[in-house]
Amino acid sequence: MKDSFLFTSESVTEGHPDKMADQISDAVLDYIIERDQKAKVACETLVANGFCMITGELKTSVYAPMQEIAREVVKKIGYTDALYGFDYRSAAVLNGVGEQSPDINQGVDREDGEIGAGDQGLMFGYACKETETLMPLPIHLAHQLTFALAQKRKDNTLPFLRPDGKSQVSVRYENNKPVSIDTIVISTQHSPEVSQKHLKESVIEEIVYKVLPKEYLHDNIKFFVNPTGKFVIGGPQGDAGLTGRKIIVDTYGGSCPHGGGAFSGKDPSKVDRSAAYAARYVAKNLVASGVCDKATVQLAYAIGVIEPVSVYVNTHNTSKYSSAELEKCVKSVFKLTPKGIIESLDLLRPIYSLTSAYGHFGRELEEFTWEKTNKAEEIQAFFKR
């Protein structure tokens, strides 16, 4: 008897209000870290109807022109006309950024050159063999759809599209392997002139069938395109957006646990971000090495402490090695102190704007060092000793 179930993940476009906030926060981080690698940045953004507020804490010698940074991000996303509900020219930009607490900083910057964790917390990484990039299929497909929504809007293939949008994909699994797409939900902001019939047909034809892998498509997929019937009011005019509210979209679409810490706007001394990247790096290399088919990795830290307080590996019964053996391997092969992570993944670079939409994982860009599988041979060698 086949074990059959559906699993669903979602994604959002770069014009979604929460993603706008993430992108502004990461643009501020990139601006500062490019000029001051010793900076400590925790940047939070709120976007709402007609305004944007940037707040958080900084420790840096760099002056960051918050207004210019925010407006450039909003312009690049595509909010270039007041008719879209938000316009980069006329939106107010408020700056409420303060200084980082010296009580926090004293535990991070150490006299011995090491870096203490910027906070306590637990972070997860995940990898599996469902896609070439070792990501779960549902979130992989959902990101493909939202990325295509933005591209078809920007290249004028579908000129009636506007920046805000979401996707959701339900995948059918049999015996824990994905076999087909069951349901696709796409909600996209649009101009008032386009008919719902034309919009739905165009989105299915130009995006779904031209973007998604043919082996998962079939005639009985259930499509819900703008199921409420109209989506003209969108972006910050429709909903306020905040940094860090799309943490499942940013990671694995719900396929593994999440420690709760968001990424955007945080420099890599914050283990919420850097250790989550490291956990993905570990999980992906474990799967790429062939010692398992699926891996969930948890790392945990205490504020001001150098070494992780715990390392946990779960291979979901896909490995001949025990969790204890795998954890020993991970500690031997990977540098999991904050400084070790920053140096091994080369994280003191202005790369974070690239991560702030369409997922931090599963995108094999040159800048995404945590997606490399250059530790796979070392893992194999560890188990041949």
From Swiss-Prot:
Catalysed reactions, semicolon-separated: L-methionine + ATP + H2O = S-adenosyl-L-methionine + phosphate + diphosphate
Binding site for L-methionine: E57, Q100, D239, K270
Localisation: Cytoplasm
Keywords of this entry: ATP-binding, Cytoplasm, Magnesium, Metal-binding, Nucleotide-binding, One-carbon metabolism, Potassium, Transferase
Pathway the protein contributes to: Amino-acid biosynthesis; S-adenosyl-L-methionine biosynthesis; S-adenosyl-L-methionine from L-methionine: step 1/1
InterPro entries cross-referenced by the UniProt entry: ADOMET_SYNTHASE_CS, S-AdoMet_synt_C, S-AdoMet_synt_central, S-AdoMet_synt_N, S-AdoMet_synthetase, S-AdoMet_synthetase_sfam
Primary subcellular site in the record, as a coarse category: cytoplasm
Binding site for Mg(2+): D18
Entry binding sites for ATP: H16, D164, G165, K166, K230, F231, D239, R245, K246, A262, K266
An example molecular function term from Gene Ontology annotations: ATP binding
Cofactor note: Binds 2 divalent ions per subunit.
PROSITE patterns: ADOMET_SYNTHASE_1, ADOMET_SYNTHASE_2
Residues involved in K(+) binding: E44
One annotated GO biological process: S-adenosylmethionine biosynthetic process
Enzyme Commission numbers on file: 2.5.1.6
CC terms in the record's Gene Ontology section: cytoplasm
Role description: Catalyzes the formation of S-adenosylmethionine (AdoMet) from methionine and ATP. The overall synthetic reaction is composed of two sequential steps, AdoMet formation and the subsequent tripolyphosphate hydrolysis which occurs prior to release of AdoMet from the enzyme.
UniProt record similarity statement: Belongs to the AdoMet synthase family.
Assembly, per entry: Homotetramer; dimer of dimers.
HAMAP family for this protein: S_AdoMet_synth1 (MF_00086)
Protein name: S-adenosylmethionine synthase
Organism ancestry: Bacteria, Pseudomonadati, Campylobacterota, Epsilonproteobacteria, Campylobacterales
